[in-house]
């Protein structure tokens, strides 16, 4: 029985090979006695198969701008100029915030489809021609490759020397007219896009006339979706921010007369409907007051802050009271334990800033020192904490008494006057965060039933700190300590 079992498991020898007439050779599925072992076959991608997706230049731009660990000053951009060929400029020299159509002469801006490569400290990290991506690790047949964070954490062993592949036609700027459209279609799926800007593209009509077509805001470079402006968690120093997207306006009909100041540009469908009743668009523009209709335009999207000015909690009595409140929270809701703010990281955020690079950090420290030492700051000498407040089932915090609203507004105005980029959220007030649950998590904080000891819950206001926000899941980094006296 055992012999029959062994014989059933082992495949039978090819009888045609024994007779010397097996026409399959090495491809035969039956074993050939004495034949060399076949070499392992490496599967190659079939011709015409779809290549792995390569993250676009828009994704790289967004990553450089919004990742706190990346310094935009370390990057440079290689792009195709219509007349000069491929040029390379520092990343910070480009204007990434305004629509291309709104920029005037002398402002450096480039559409997304003209970008050829990115360099990080002189090394090529993203190249369209060679499908190199050391920012996200995309575009590799073998799967995810090394990323920019791997290189930052591990050193040079993750880097491979890559040379940018530049066609001869691009080196001299010859034959670029048709190249722009082809590259735009290849990367954007048929729709040329700019670098997150409202680009104006020229299209030829019949008869040789040229008309301008607005493509609208490029959705591929929108700010990462994070907490909205009404979320009070935005002032804890680590929360990402989001403002509503700017709405698109209807294209207006052309009005020949400009002498009447109250004439209003109406949507084309509305103007046509009015003209059918015997009135022209110009006449109806005078009848309809602009104030009748509500303004649908919303504020532009706020940039994500990278730094913040904060008051650190240093009093041991206040820290002990916060720990007691957190322990009470864990007893009634054990699932909230992982979302508690450590006692050594307790702080109140006063100002949110958007800074890029060590140079702006040093300038912000000097500007903050001047703003604090200037008279009229209205800073209270001591803060008291008693009541706990739940903000949207995601943030448990304690509000200070007296409030820091006046001091925060004064600092915002003074730092803006110094030329710093301040992220303003007027609906938010400085508060002490005890626990914070990220949005999208199923856990909800319960209603607070604990009150801090008013005698122990005190914090003198003598120093402010300039801090850099950490990555997701990491704490912030204090940079500069500035005394209020």
From Swiss-Prot:
Zinc finger region(s), C3H1-type: 8-35
Gene3D superfamilies membership: Cyclic phosphodiesterase, Zinc finger, CCCH-type
Alphabetical list of PROSITE patterns matching this protein: ZF_C3H1
GO MF entry, a single one: zinc ion binding
Positions of region (Disordered): 212-247
Record flagged with keyword Zinc-finger: yes
Sorted UniProt keywords: Metal-binding, Zinc, Zinc-finger
Protein name (record): Leukocyte receptor cluster member 9
Species assigned in the record: Mus musculus
